[in-house]
Amino acid sequence: MEFLVRSENRLPADFPAERRAELRAGERARATELRSAGVLKRLWRVPGRNATVGLYEAADPAELHDALMSLPMSPWLDVSVEALATHPQERT
């Protein structure tokens, strides 16, 4: 299944800079792992916001949930998920 995942980082502005840097590095590393595993297909930034839009592939919603919760910043992410269905024009 493919999923469109929108996430906005809600890390507090006064969060310690050193810890913020650690989380960002961990987030980058985990995203690379998810990409290598074929779970994270595409990732875009949203201009003007601390937000991303990603195309993920997982066997089911539970597997996607596990992948998203494995992100180091997951406690501070505001996430919305839309399951995607193939459009008839894409089936040819």
Where are these regions (language model features)?
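Conserved, structured core segments of small domains
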Residues: 1-92
